[in-house]
């Protein structure tokens, strides 16, 4: 036994709050982290987002609540993780020049499909930073403004063809993008019932 003294510094505060509110506090550590249905829904959504990141496991995309499509560096993954933390099962599929989009994207009916786009100049800046961090050559179409503009235009045409809502994430935080997606998702649920 270490014989370290325990000083209950919060007891006076909890006692005063209890007196003020006319109730007694219960000494149950961890009560703020209740494992209820909402908690398990968030865990399931998080597992789904991780399993369906970057176009993986496309065979069961119809199980998603939301599917995000976008070119590289449009914040698809962090947005999915943020939404999953709110209990929304979200998958993301990249749009990569020369690589076909999984056919399942065009066959699904349940999920809300949303396109993410970004200003080409801003996208080139972000991609350049990424290449520098990875110590990669910057002489590539990945950061060529003309090619990136073409990439974004092709993505926009795809979104328009399928009448998928589009969010320009150029000047939005992950939280703002997620809030917009959540509102679109709620609107869709409201019209289904």
Residue ranges of predicted features:
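Short beta-strand-centered segment that lines the nucleotide-binding/catalytic pocket of NTP-utilizing
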Residues: 90-101
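A glycine- and Lys/Arg-enriched "phosphate-lid" helix/loop adjacent to the NTP-binding pocket
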Residues: 20, 110-150
